[in-house]
Structures are given as C-alpha cells and as structure tokens.
Amino acid sequence: MEGSLLVASSASNNETANNVESTDGATRRISFAKIHEPLDVPNLLALQTESFDWLVGNGRWQDRMQKAVDAGDESVATTSGLSDIFEEISPIEDFQGTMSLSFSEPEFADPKYTMAECKDRDATFSAPLYVKAEFMNNNTGEIKQQTVFMGDFPLMTEKGTFVINGTERVVVSQLVRSPGAYFERTADKTSDKDIFTAKIIPSRGAWFELEIDKRDQVGVRLDRKRKQSVTVLLKALGWTESQILEEFGEFDSIRATLEKDGTSTREDALLDIYRKLRPGEPPTVEAAQTLLDNLYFNPKRYDLAKVGRYKINRKLGIDKSLASPDASVLDINDIVAIIKFLVTLHAGGKSLTAKRDGKDFELRVDVDDIDHFGNRRIRAVGELIENQVRTGLSRMERVVRERMTTQDVEAITPQTLINIRPVVAAIKEFFGTSQLSQFMDQNNPLAGLTHKRRLSALGPGGLSRDRAGYEVRDVHPSHYGRMCPIETPEGPNIGLIGSLASYGRINPLGFIETPYRKVSKGHVSDEVDYLTADDELNYIIAQANAPLDSKSSFVEDQVLVRQRGGGGEPVLVAADDVEYMDVSPRQMVSVATALIPFLEHDDANRALMGANMQRQAVPLVRSEAPVVGTGMERAAAVDAGDVVIAKKAGVVTEVSADLVIMLNDDGTETNYRIAKYNRSNQGTAYNQRVLVSEGARLEVGGIIADGPATDQGELALGKNLLVAFMSWEGHNFEDAIILSQRLVSEDVLSSIHIEEHEIDARDTKLGAEEITRDIPNVSEEILAGLDERGIIHIGAEVDAGDILVGKVTPKGETELTPEERLLRAIFGDKSGEVRDTSLKVPHGESGTVIGVRFFDRENDDDLAPGVNQLVRIYVAAKRKITNGDKLAGRHGNKGVISKILPIEDMPFLADGTPVDIVLNPLGVPGRMNVGQVLELHLGWIAKTGWKIDGEPDWVKNLPNLPRETGRDQILATPVFDGAREEEISGLLDSTNVTRDGDLLINRSGKTRLFDGRSGEPFPDPISVGYMYILKLHHLVDDKIHARSTGPYSMITQQPLGGKAQFGGQRFGEMEVWALEAYGAAYTLQELLTIKSDDIHGRVKVYEAIVKGENIPEPGIPESFKVLIKEMRSLCLNVEVLSTEGSTIEMRDSDEEVFRAAEELGIDLSRAEPNSVEEV
C-alpha cells in the first residue's frame, strides 16, 4: 500500500487539486499533516493471517521464517504449529513400551470446494490433512509406514476469515496472562504486615505457589493443595539442611521455616509431601517421587511453553536456553531462584546479582503488575486452533493405546490404530461453539476489519465479565501503541474487549510490539525498532509531535518524554538523552479511532461511541468518501479485503459486471470475480462495482473494483451533507434530527437489504413432503408468481404473507372407504391428505426476489440426513431513510430522525441552497465533542474551494497546500496532526465566492440563514457546513411491529413477547396502576381478560365481532387459574366464590369454544413450531 496515496503533502508534485486521479484510480487527498512518518501503516490483517500461516506452515510463512533466520533473529519459530504438535505427541507407546506410533510431515491436499461454492452449499472451506504415520514394533524392529488422513482442516480465506457451514466466521485473538513467575504483595487483614506471594503459572500443568505469612515463614502450595514448609520441598528435591543454610542462611524467614520443619531426610520429606497431596492413600517413597516428578518435571504433564521459560529467565535472572530440551519444565535452579527472589523481596532487598548471556548483572527485585502488557500476551488464531488440535490428539492417544493392547501385533498398521474422530470433533467444536469463534460482523468493511483485529480477555482460560474488576478493564500506560485506549464496547464488556492499535504487531512469543524511531545524540533516524512493553521500560521515548528541523534533529533543547521504568507523568529531558521517538501520532489508536477527524478535540467517551458507531454504518446505494478524512481511509478499505485489487501489474483485457480479466506483464492471465448483490451476515447488500475499463493499465495494488461502502478505493461509510446547527420549532429537541425530503427522493441515504428465506422438504413418518404448485385451498391468483415447480420466479415483487415456495406435508387421517379412494384417484383431490406448509414472506417484510437456489438430493447435492430438497429465496428491499431511523456523525453525535421536511420548508443559505439536515446546537457543549464543529467548517472549505491571497502566517506550516483550488476538494486531517484552528479560520476567510461575489461564510464559520416557510432571515448567524453523516443499522423498519392474533404462551396462555415471536405489547404492572388511577375499569378488564388470557372469552369476542353482536362478558383469565393451582400445590385450598357466595366452577365447556372456532376458521390446535423464530 503506497504511502504517497494517503497524503498529498508527501507527494513531490503537488498538483492543484480538483481530485487528481492517480494511476490506480485512487483520489489524492490534500493533507494537513506536518509530521513526517517513516513507516506506512502495516498490513492490518497480519494479526490473523500470519498466525494461521505459522500453524499450517505454508509458503508465505516459510518465506518469512527464512528472512528472519537470514537476519539472525533467533526468536522466530522454525517449525510450523502442526509439526510441533505431532512431534510433541510422538511417539505414542503402549503400556509395556513394546510398540510405538509416531507422526511427522503434516501436509494438505487441495480443498474440495472453492470458498464461493462452500458459501453456496453450506459447506466448510477446508482442505484434507494428511500425516505420515510410522508404526514400530520394538521387539522385532519392524517398521510400517502409511500416509494417514487426519480429517478436513478449516482454511483461512485471504480476508482472514473462515467459512464454516456456509457462514463467514472470525476467530478473535485472546488476551491472557502470560505463563511465568509472578510476585505480589497484599496487606494482611489481621496484622499490619505485608504478605508476599510468588506463583509460577505454566502454559499447562500444576501451579507452584510460595507465600511468606505474617509469622515470616515460607510456605509452598503444590497444585493448589494444602500449604507446607518450603524447606520440606527443598529436602525432597535432594538438598540437605546445610545446603539450605549455605544458600539462604542470611534470610530470617528461611531460618524460621527450618526451625518449624520436622523432617530430616529426603525420604521423610517426600512422604510428608505425599500425605498433603494425597491424604488417605498409603504413602510410599516411590509413589511420592513419581507424583512430584509428574507435577513439575515431566514434559508430558507440565509445559511452561517457550514464552513461560522466557519470562522466568527474565524475571529470575536464569540463563537457560529456550531451545534446550528441558526448557519447558522446572528444575531445582528455578525453584531456588524463585525462593531467593521472594525472600529478598520480603527482606526489603532491591536487587540481586544474576547472570544473562554468561555475564553478571543487577536484577531488579520488585512485585509485578499483572495488568502490564509485559505480563499479558495474545493467543492468536494459530495458537487457539493448535491447542484444540492438541486436545483432540491427546484423546486419540488414549484410543491408540487401547487398540495396541487389544489388536493382533502382526495385523496392526497405523491405519487400524488411528481413530480421527476425536481430532475432527475437537476442531469442529472449536469453530462451531467456542466463545472466540464468532459470526463475522459484515455490516461494512470497517466492521469486518475491526472484528479481525479485536482482542478479547474473555473466553476459555480468560476472565469472565462478572468477576473482572476495575483494574483489568482500565487503560494502562503499557497499552500505548499496542491496544487502543478509545475503542471498547459500552456495557458489561467495557475494557475486556479492545482493538489492536494501528501499528501494533504480535511477536513470536505472543507479546504486542510497537515501532519506534531510533534517536542518537538528538538526531532522529528513519531506522525503526519494534519494542515489547517490557523492552520499552528501559528507554527514554519522545512523542511523535516533538518538533524536528529539516535534518531530523530536535528543534528544542528540552523534549517531553516518557521516563524509563514507565508510569508517572511525562517529563522534560535534554534532547541528547532521548533514545527513541514515536513513529506516528496515530500510533496509539486503532483503525476505527484513527478514522475520526479532529479526534484530539473530542471527549474520550464520545470518541468511543464514534469509533463504535462507524462499525454500524449501513452501506448506501451510492457510496461517497468523506470530504474531511484522516488519510487512513484507503488503508482501511484495501486491507479489509472488500476492494478488488490487482495482484500483478498488467493491462485490463475484458470487463463485465461480474468479471474482469487482466493480462499481466509476466504473460499470465488473471480473472477477478466481482460480487453482485450478495447477502452479508447482517443482511446488508454486498455489492462490488468495476472502476476500470478495457485497455486500462494497472500496477500491483491498483484498484479494479469498489466494494460496499468504498469509493475509489477509500472507505466511504456515509454521505457529506449540508448541516445547520439551529433549533427548529422544537422538532430537534434532545438529539432529534430534521431532514430534507431531498435525501428521500434522491435516494441519498437509501440502502439495500437482502433477506434469506429457506425451506426444506423432508421425509416424515407419514410420507415425504413435497415442493409443489398444487397447494390445497389456495386460489390461482395467489399462486400466480410461482413457476411449475412451485417456486417464486426471480424479479417478483412480494409482500408479507405471499407464498415464496409451495410445500405440502402429508397429514395422518382415518382409513378411507374403497369408494372414496376411487373418487380421489379419479379427481386427484389431495386436500384431505395433505396440509399447506408453504414458505411465506414473514410479517412486516416485502421486496423483490433477486435469487433462488434449489438443491435436490437427486442432483447429488449434499443435504442433511432426511432432507430431499432445499430451496433458498433471496428477497431484496430498498430502504429509504424515514422517521425513526438513526443517524450519527463520526464524533459520537447520534440522533433519531423526528421529521422529514419538504425541501421548500428547509432553512436556506443566501444563495438559495437549502440545508440537508438540522441538528440541535445544544448537543455539542455538554458532550464536549467539538471535533464535529471543526469538521463542519473544514467540510465547507473543502466543498467551496479556496483562494489564498499573499502569504499569511498560518500558511507557513503548510508548504504543500495549493494556494488556489476549485470546488469539491477532498482533505485529510490526520489524528493528533490535523488542521489547526487558525488554519481553518484563515481558509474560511479565503473560500471561493458565489456568482454574486459574496463570501457566504467568513472566519466565524457562521452565516445568515433564511426560513424556508416565510423567507424571513433567522435573527442570529448560524454555523453551517458539510459533515459526514452515517446511517446506522438501527432501522425503524426492523423494529416496528403490530400483532392481530398470534401465538400464546403454553402455560399462562398470554401472548408471547417480542417481534421475532410475533408477540403482543406487554401491559405491565405500572400501566395497570395508571388505568386504575383513572378509574378506567372496563378498559382494564378487557386488557386483562379477553385481550390476553381469557381463552374462551377471546374466541367468543372474535365470534361476536364477526357476527356483529355485542361483546360478551369476560370470563376467568388463565393466569388466575394458574395462580390457584400454585396455591393448591402449597396445600392451600382456594375456592372462587360469586357475589352470592356460591362456588364458581373453574372448568368451562370446551365444546362451545371449539364449535365457534370451527365456524370462524380459527385453528386452536397449537402447532409445534418448526424453528425458534416461530415460537
């Protein structure tokens, strides 16, 4: 992705703008940036793709690994994730050790279906995984080799998603506590002493905990069991009392512990440990030794992982190679080192002498901050799937062991031993049900991109939202450049779910690194180093906006920096002392936050809403890039993967709506498929539009087609509208919005939504269901839109209740007489034996049928067991903007449309231009999101163009700003490095004049507006300008709902609730009080009985209405009967008495009700719902 396309100020030839087209169709933005950035924004999907590449060990990963090895980087993994697991589990030996089975060289065959076919067929996009399995008989030395199929392994698409059962899903990266050694200090509740604890947390296996209590004794807790003296453990590991005193004699805490310790020999110590860990079992020295070995010293049972060993080495000053075979388990040196660190900490020591790379150095002794990003790491996709495969293989290992003992040695082959079911099931379970495998958010390209870059502290092995306190959720200084401090959800997950910062990347150990420019002796170079949160603590780092001269040296002698050791306030230091400098001002924020212009003028809470609401923007019929952008729009759109990009340089040879063919410079030909009106996960239209014509030349990365919500390869989530900040007859009170009818009639804010409707024909006990046009008791005009198969034709306009697919289901009935059977055979009267179960358009929906997919078992389509045919209908509807829809800007300024005014009634400017939208000015000061006002002014400047006379002071910082432009410019004002207030004021004064020679808006940003109804001017000047407005997914059409008669709850017989259940409105407790207060007794009685759960009454009312009779008296509601039943279950005999004192019988005669129901054609038999939606 070329940096020069992001900002015009970095282009050498600054053409006078009029949207100069570059070779690849992207438009040039005029940028207000002043800071040179040595590094482009990296590939924003690398978090997902690189992790998965490592797991499967594909070509891209091998190239990257080779580069890293050539560059001398030792931290990079040299074996793929799958190879690691198979190596780890090999060899599987039987209980006697006579046979072994080992695995190597995992390989993938080609996928069965392409990604598009998988979406069509509801299949999983996966490739068959094969492994070389070797069976060895240790007695005879005989070896049998086979290549074994290990199941279908889901593959990641180019966009970083997975297609599982036909739907796109994303695996979210998890933020977890890193394995390693941790030290804590807590105040004792009973005394004023501090209690010190140490823990070694492994990647998997038993915890090892030490504690110095208020009596100054050092206790150890193995595997979360009872506490015992640490000296007992040391003796069990072979140390004598004199060795312990020699090593720890200077510490009172260890001396006190030794005095209390009653064991003298190693055997005693082992037995003592065994009694504590396995109370009730007879202790033996061998069993105790095995138990202890298995807990911490056996690689099969205990694994620190590379990262755990790295953290322990760093924390305790141990010099043990990460590559050594026993690096993943503890040894006596680790245990001694952690005890020494803890007792030093308790004694008030500040440092220890330790070794690193063979040299002595001072090790700082301090407690840990577990929320620091040096102690929290990322488990990305690759590692999450790897853990799942490991689980599956360990289950398979048990099966293999059992089969080794039961099968005949001669007949055994690897194939007969292996059962791949547990492995396949583990992978399926992870992708289908894990909390971290999520249905992809496809509202717009940004929503998908952000979803893939999400970091979640929830999920298996993570936190739970109920138990997470404030500390974990809080913004931490180590988040800088790693996790965005702004973008996080509102609500119970706040702070637990974050987003990776724009420049952040994950190192091989799972820690997030962020780039810094190297500084030496006050000179800032373009050399970039990536630092983890731990590394960063050792340096003095300046921020990106520290002023530099033309030679990249600091202008000022004193520079504002973040101190060594982190935390604390920024301080001023001499320029020569600075060691690193931020790469870019937007380094600390995520992609969505970096798309908010003038973010620096917005309150953080509103910026959070702005970042989150951009993800809810619906792609509009015609996309329009923002006139006031931040320069991040192109990177976001391209990396989201919804824009079609040239993979190789070449010339376009053929263009059609859904296919572009390019002849590449290397002689090959590439076909680029263009998606047309597909349905996204959220029901929005996923449509791509070709931008190139035949004969056009494109370089690598050139844009071939725009996707949804992109414009010329830039992210375009909304529309630039003319906004006035004023009150209008109180219609924009409390964030309500007034719109112009123009936006409705010209489809400015219209969007296309596509719904999918599905029906299948199954085998039932009474016979097969049939998809047919021959439906009983349905008139021909209703069937007019169906073809001969009974399926609606493409292009048909449908409304709620229309039949999309005709289907009949056999129903059981009494035996027919031979005469009836004969008549039926002659006249083909089916009505008696089948019922109509056709697929109809649900309530409140309508649109045009744009797609039909028909699957039939006879055509060899893969269908679920018992399903013979499956039909999918796609219905598209154009939703115009309407009252009740939600609009928002990019600064958290959201509102609901209250009134749509005719164009002639809208306020208008002096040149007659009516405004598009009227917002309430009171929405700005209290919310402190002033960025929207600056955007408004700059939007006006961009739309009108400018002509600068002379060289005023404010222009000197903008050498690349064109001095004269036409109308309709597009600008970039990057986050924390954007247009300043004096620049905006100066440009407002210099904007182009109207045909009459008037300057409509001067440096105040305000103008005189006229009332469209009277033509009179409003008394005060009003802020007017262009603002970028998004239409959010909260559309009133999806929410509005009405019910006539519908389903009732089984027990209370009251109507169900909610639109999905076609439910009623709840008339709750408080509403009842209101009617009681007004004395509206009859209205209330109706609501509580015949309109709700008086079963017989409601049928009789229906009958009375149909026959035109008076409404009958209400009966007893069902809920009252339920109440009486509940009281009877408590042994209280409750009777209902009439006013005369006679007992009222609670049973009504059902015959009458069923008679009335039959007459009126009401179906009282409660059909079992086919799906959750019908409940």
Swiss-Prot record:
EC top class, as a word: transferase
State one Pfam family annotation: RNA_pol_Rpb2_6
Query: Which chemical reaction does it catalyze?
Result: RNA(n) + a ribonucleoside 5'-triphosphate = RNA(n+1) + diphosphate
Entry-linked CDD domains? RNA_pol_B_RPB2 (cd00653)
- BP GO terms, sorted: DNA-templated transcription
Entry's Gene Ontology molecular function annotations: DNA binding; DNA-directed RNA polymerase activity; ribonucleoside binding
Listed A to Z, the keywords are: DNA-directed RNA polymerase, Nucleotidyltransferase, Transcription, Transferase
- Chain segments carrying region Disordered: 1-24
- GO cellular component labels: DNA-directed RNA polymerase complex
Task: Indicate, by first and last residue, each region the UniProt record lists as having compositional bias (Low complexity).
Answer: 7-23
Stated EC number for the protein is 2.7.7.6
Xref: InterPro entries: DNA-dir_RNA_pol_bsu_ext_1_sf, DNA-dir_RNA_pol_bsu_external_1, DNA-dir_RNA_pol_su2, DNA-dir_RNAP_su2_dom, DNA-dir_RNAP_su2_hyb_sf, RNA_pol_bsu_bac, RNA_pol_bsu_CS, RNA_pol_bsu_protrusion
What is the purpose of this protein? DNA-dependent RNA polymerase catalyzes the transcription of DNA into RNA using the four ribonucleoside triphosphates as substrates.
Give the quaternary structure: The RNAP catalytic core consists of 2 alpha, 1 beta, 1 beta' and 1 omega subunit. When a sigma factor is associated with the core the holoenzyme is formed, which can initiate transcription.
Q: Which family does it belong to?
A: Belongs to the RNA polymerase beta chain family.
Its recorded name reads: DNA-directed RNA polymerase subunit beta
Q: Which organism is it from?
A: Renibacterium salmoninarum (strain ATCC 33209 / DSM 20767 / JCM 11484 / NBRC 15589 / NCIMB 2235)
